[in-house]
Amino acid sequence: MEHNYEWGLEKNPANYSPVSPLEFISRAAEVYPDKLAVVHGKTKRTWSETYKRCLKFASALKKTGIKKGDTVAVMLPNIPEMVEAHFSIPLCGAVINALNIRLDPDSISFMLQHGEAKIVLVDREFTSVISQAILRMENPPLIINVEDEMYSGPGEKIGKIEYEEFMKKGDDSYLGEMPEDEWSAIALNYTSGTTGNPKGVVYHHRGAYLGALSNILEWDMQKHPHYLWTLPMFHCNGWTFPWVIAARAGLNICLRKIDAKLIFDLIREHGVTHYCGAPIVHNQLINAPEEFKRDIKHKVEAFVAGAAPPAAMIEGMSVLGFNITHVYGLTEVYGPASVCAKQESWESLPIGEQAKLNARQGVRYHLQSGTTVMDPETMKQVPADGETIGEVMFRGNITMKGYLKNPKATKEAFKGGWFHTGDLAVLNPDGYIKIKDRSKDIIISGGENISSIEVEDVLYQHPAVLLAAVVAKPDEKWGEVVAAFIELKNGSTVTVEELVNHCKHHLPKFKVPKAIEFCELPKTSTGKIQKFELRKKVNSTEAIDV
């Protein structure tokens, strides 16, 4: 039955419009037209210039036949055209599919076919992969070449038209298209498939809008930040930060590849205020030569996510004067969707204790409805005792629409009205989540559960260790035992026995690694350690009796 607050109070264009992060760039161009939006080498563009370019490129896409719901893929590093693509593609109603630049031709070919990409924007460095990928396709997409002034390496142009030339096809008068429904798709991101084909995660305009606002709120981000692109924009659309920086009319400082010296140089040159990255990026900065780090006299804010960060890494960055905020999430929740919100009471603790508290996965984002740890069988929240293990689950607006063309996987992921992450965690008495492991990373030795993260944290405390990864090694007696792969810092040495003794001082005997191998660890393009590669070789690791 209709009540008084429904009668005659219908939605109309004057009192309602679907939300979209596309609103951010139009406002930035309107209110701060002359503020720098992007810098990359000699290229500098204002928000007014950037918005005009995005609209013109969107118009060119439309003239080429791209329509609402079509997919336009991009295989680009962190360059200005990648920033523009996050606006120009959805401004014509299409969906942006940012491809992982580290993937092989078979994986890229699958994604292009599964997502039905009509056009691919490709940087010359990656044309070899794209050219091989489209050979496997019945209906190859139109290729648009993107030339970066900062790249002088190998690679042939394979497209029929250049990015700038294509843009000229667009109309200067085009105003862009806002979504009629905020539930409309804005982006397609593929999960890294360690088994089988990757799944296509679909984002909606509402989630992208609220995810961006949540990042601003969690960081207390002021107007006009100077944001350094250490995080790949192909990873969860740069955790929504192309839209975040537009919302704050900030400066996008592009970075083609991770290089510690260049990062410190850019921090000094452009007064970088914010950046994001996986623990491996921060480790590179901590362990960079001291001369790289000189004369940084302002506070730099950093988000860290990806693999659970060791407390030693957070402590090390704090010593450098970088304020680290630990966030947690997955592709399916637009990147970060929970934060280890810092409490004033922690400030009086020793820095090591602060680092341990900050290493937790924390609490839900402002605009995410729920983040907790639940028993996946009963779908009840686990006790907040810091001991009972359950599965981390999310629900709310910062959660994907679902998996493209995969209703079975979508239904399974949303079972019980929550998104199931597959991450195993405990709920602490203060309500903060602490991940113990991915469900597949828990090591069960003689009936005892061993968290690989716990063992890795101890290994990271050794001064010679740069990176550590722990996996299960099959064992006839115990079922599984702990195997550790170690990448050492440059110039550092340590023996297997020394590392084992170090672990014995901090862990019960059954958790101490029974096999250790020194090597360069395999990593994804975002710096995550590829444990599935380590599991393949685990049977060949050096055996140690402990």
Question: Model-derived features: where do they sit?
Answer:
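Conserved AMP-binding/adenylate-forming core of the ANL superfamily
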Residues: 16-17, 22-26, 34-79, 83-87, ...
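Structural core segment of the AMP-binding/adenylate-forming
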Residues: 24, 63-64, 91-168, 490-492
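Conserved pre-ATP/AMP-binding loop-to-beta segment of ANL
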Residues: 33, 144-145, 159-161, 167-190, ...
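Conserved AMP-binding A3 loop
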Residues: 46-49, 186-210
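AMP-binding/adenylate-forming catalytic core of the ANL superfamily
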Residues: 103, 120-122, 275, 396, ...
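Conserved AMP-binding/adenylation subdomain of ANL enzymes
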Residues: 209-226, 234-274, 288-289
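Gly/Ser/Thr-rich phosphate-binding loop
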Residues: 247, 272-277, 286-356, 369-370, ...
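Conserved beta-loop-beta connector loops within the AMP-binding
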Residues: 364-393, 429-430, 492-496, 530
